[in-house]
Amino acid sequence: MPRLTEQERQDILRYLEADKPLPDKYRFLLFEDKREVELVWNGKTNEVCNVVLPFQVIEQVDEPRAEKPEDASLQLSLFDQRGRQLTGWTNKLIWGDNKLILSSLKNGPLREEIERQGGLKLIYIDPPFDVGANFSMDIEIGSDTFTKKANILEEIAYRDTWGKGADSFIAMIYERLILMRDLLAENGSIYLHIGRNVSHLIRLVCDEVFGSSQSINEITWKRSHAHGDTGQGAIHFGRVTEAILFYSKTDKTQWNAQYTDYSDEIISRDYKYIDEVTGERYRLMPVDGPGGAAKGNPYYEFLGVKGWWRYSESRMKELYDAGEIVLSSTGKSLSRKRFLKDAKGTPVTDLWDDLNRISPTSNERLGYDTQKPEALLERIINASSDEGDLIADFFCGSGTIAAVAEKLGRKWIVCDLGKFAIHTTRKRLIGVQRQLKAEGKDYRAFEILNLGKYERQHYIGVNLNLRQAEQQLSLIHISEPTRPY
């Protein structure tokens, strides 16, 4: 710690005598801190919830059937002949406050079950990021649109989240990110879908929780190809993008590169040759070995051309016999045919402009205002998990992550505070099960859980030692603090 000057000592004494908080500069002078940059906001605390509440099963959807003694052949499989799950992990749709859910998953008995599945390999969250919104929601039913108001639990949650604007939102997400980080497998990763109004702040929060070195990408999703809203009097460029922050827990991140199909322009430019035998398009790739002997490349003569090659002589012969080695018209160089059908496509970058938001006529559309397209989640799930892995979404909304995870053969945990979100997700997942069954594919059972009888009173701060009538009065006061009673 650096030595204080006499003036600094006197200043500290004056602040203490006046019972005033010390300016930040004295905190850094008095207490050693190796961090070069620190993120501070009103009400910041390092305390993290460690409450463990019991999960209660509300409903088991497609409960696995008991095996019959004569069905010995089925005992070697997790699924019966119709694809229905018989044993193993049951997916979980949880109703309640995600902070208490995360804390109970991390510190409770379900943690051991999660670890047996290899831990959480992927978390995707799309938290409500509209600062100042009242979080009512327009719902489409047939040709009509209705406005769904937040229930008392949602109102309290949203008021606590946005009551102080960005400060309270950051405090909310900070604690939950710490809990999510601790639940992730060592090779796990997290994607945060964030709006432009808070993305710059949340990136700083993620840097603090995961470390800036674990920031892999800031993905820009161009969700709309619509024109800007200048015609309506806007004085800004059209806002058609959202950010998706991609972080890993460690340097051992699980990763599967993703590709998109080549455009017609790339195909006509790069794959301009047509094979005379198969009619397949191909391009010519070099087979010479740059660096020669220094790179360990072999030297030999092939088809009258001497040189350093990237393939062994026996491998070159195999390719030639397969019709893939081509001698140039000058007879001085060799190339290899690379067929379009064998190409993976164009590697996906951090600009996603090929995945539009859900259109009004889409079959995916559920009338849920913040619903994301399945193709978006499919790309994320395929990139950062493998079949059979466990993934999660702790702001599940309409349940897109669970629906796509089920179709891709992943296990899942999702939760939401909103009752409508739970109902929407439940109905959607039953539809996915029916679809998979009709296609002859495997599907898992899922259970709907909450955090036990007293989770809601615990969450909204009702004293459980009060008599029932007093608890009801307390609940009214919490929901309407200005109402006399």
Language-model regions, residue ranges each:
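Conserved proline-anchored active-site loop of SAM-dependent methyltransferases
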Residues: 118-137, 206, 391-405, 415
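Conserved S-adenosyl-L-methionine
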Residues: 60, 373-448
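DnaQ-like (DEDDh/DEDDy) 3′-5′ exonuclease domain used for proofreading
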Residues: 1-125, 129-179, 187, 455, ...
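Single conserved hydrophobic/aromatic residue that forms the stacking wall/gate
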Residues: 476-485
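Conserved Class I SAM-dependent methyltransferase catalytic core
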Residues: 161-221
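N-terminal auxiliary segments of SAM/dcSAM-dependent transferases
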Residues: 258-343
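Flexible, glycine-/basic-rich loop-and-beta segments that form/coincide
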Residues: 226-291, 458, 466
